[in-house]
Each structure stands twice: as structure tokens, then as C-alpha cells.
């Protein structure tokens, strides 16, 4: 079973990866196949804390990340502008080179833009103004910016900080985690709930 690795830094936004993890770990729909295993990675194996106060003990650190995995998902939060976040750059470079699924939501999408990873693909973030305010000269992709909750271009998926459900849907599509019908049904269930308006 292939792994999907969630990159978590301190003060990560716990809600941004919750739906993806549940769909991958339990199946997109009840009784659906479970083709992936969720794993977490951080700079070290010391516990990382979320904005909501959850503490996670990472499965991997920078020294023991496996070569064989299906996707690298960068969960947003308050530490993507820190010096320690720079240590994640080689992981993203290798994942893109190896044609893995790579996702970044909220400030993690800004991190991807800061390092030039989004210059040649359609992408989104927390508005183009927010993105430009935080990225440097390596970002030249503003003509590829799309004002949507989440955008998938090939194997690269980005989302703004309120697009966790759309981010989940696009990652499930990129990973071919289930049929299109099951992915859409799951998305609409989480979006609309038991009592759609």
C-alpha cells in the first residue's frame, strides 16, 4: 500500500488535512477500497503542535523519509515563512522531479510559490495580493494564478486556507483514490452535510 506523506510544521492548520487523511485512511466512501496509507513528516521526530492544540508525533523526519510514496501534502499553518521550512525545499524538488502528487494549502501554497514551484502551473492561494505580498523574485507565475478554492494542474494541487474540502477533492482525483462519482459524492456530503440547504 502506497503512502501519502503529510508535511506538518509547528502551528499547522489541523483542519486543512483532516478530510484528506480520513478519505485516504478509511476510503473515500464507506466500504470503498483503501489504496493509501497516511503518514506524517516534520523536520524532526519531536512532536509538532497544531493551531488547534493537537500534538502529532511524526512518522518520519528529514533523515528517514521513504523513497517510495505516492504524494507529498504540505499542510498550511504559521511556520511556512520560518527558516526551518526551508529544509522542506529539497523534498518538494525531488517529489516534483519524481512526478509525485504535491499539494500545498494556505501558507504552504505561498511556500511553493516562494520557491518557484508554481511558476509554470495553474495555481491558487490566499488571494493573489496575499501571495505577492509574501513571495520574492522567484515567483513569476502570476499569469497562472486562478481565483478558486483549489486548483489542480497535473500532479500539483494548491488551495487557499478556506478550501480544505476542494483541496481534498483535487488530491483524491490526482491520486486516483476512487471513481470520479465516489469522489464527488464524498465532496458533496462533506460540503452540504445531512441537511443541504
Summary of predicted features, one role per range:
Residues 2-5, 12-13, 19, 26-44, ...:
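Active-site-adjacent pocket-lining segments in enzyme domains
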